Design a protein with these regions (language model features):
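Nucleotide 5′-phosphate-binding alpha/beta core
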Residues: 1-107, 113-129, 133-146, 153, ...
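Conserved adenylate-forming
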Residues: 43, 153-250
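A generic structural signal for short, solvent-exposed coil/turn residues
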Residues: 110, 139-141, 170, 249-250
Length: 250
């Protein structure tokens, strides 16, 4: 908890607040969590219709009324948000109440081609990290564990990882980083192997395909570690059975 408190101070966020809320909901009866979800979703839809030009237009075209929303089935009326929408209409997707306020840019990993950029405020960043931590805790992961993050597209690595706040956060959480997009280079695969061997990480997390590619490299080259990584957490891409077996065997 102290590490999250320190990270919040460094980055001007409120992760601890959301973490407490999500942990309470995680242990609450299903009926309570479903009721909470519906109330919050309706509030969000009303906010979007009143304050977000893109969604005001989309709801009107779909014949959808946020005020009359009463069933999850009604969401089928709204066309899905696409990558093209995010790229072409990003200014209209920002709520009018947030125009001129400080927003940070985030981006997708770019694993399907061109990364998609989006904007978020400190509340979104804090809530996202809190949800991330609660999700990991379901696997048995603990915040005190030392980990390696195999992640990042060139934009994220070059623009975000070098920031002082990002480096301090990594130190506080004992969470090192390795750029996933460089693993097409055989020398970088060996560099990653030597890093993990030397640092003796408790867990590794990152893109499914990047971690599978590394596991396959270990197998093909007859490489192994002197210590066992306790957890491997994959994300952003589907984990197929053959990939799971390869990662477990490595």
């Amino acid at each position: 908890r102290l590490s999250i408190f320190i990270s919040d101070l460094i980055k001007g966020q409120n992760t601890l607040h959301y973490l407490r809320r999500f942990e309470r909901l995680r242990n609450a009866p299903r009926e309570e969590t479903e009721a909470y979800r519906f109330v919050r979703l309706k509030e969000l839809l009303i906010h979007c219709e009143r304050n977000v030009p893109f969604y005001r237009e989309r709801f009107r075209e779909a014949g959808f009324s946020s005020v009359e929303f009463s069933s999850l089935e009604q969401l089928r009326q709204i066309p899905p948000l696409t990558r093209q929408d995010l790229q072409d209409r990003w200014e209209d997707i920002i709520a009018t109440s947030y125009r001129g306020k400080r927003l940070s840019a985030g981006s997708s990993g770019g694993s399907t081609g061109q990364p998609v950029t989006y904007r978020k405020d400190s509340h979104a960043t804090s809530a996202g990290l809190a949800a991330h931590l609660v999700g990991w805790s379901l696997s048995g992961w603990k915040m005190s564990m030392k980990g390696l993050h195999i992640w990042g597209n060139p934009t994220t690595v070059n623009e975000e990882w070098g920031r002082v706040s990002s480096k301090l956060k990594a130190r506080v959480f004992r969470h090192h980083k390795f750029p996933a997009y460089t693993l097409h280079d055989g020398s970088r695969l060996n560099e990653l192997y030597e890093l993990i061997s030397g640092e003796r990480y408790d867990f590794i997390d990152g893109y499914t395909n990047a971690i599978y590619h590394f596991a396959d490299y270990l197998k093909r080259n007859g490489l192994s570690f002197n210590h066992k990584v306790k957890y491997v957490l994959t994300t952003a891409e589907n984990l197929h059975d053959f990939q799971r077996r390869a990662i477990e065997d490595a």
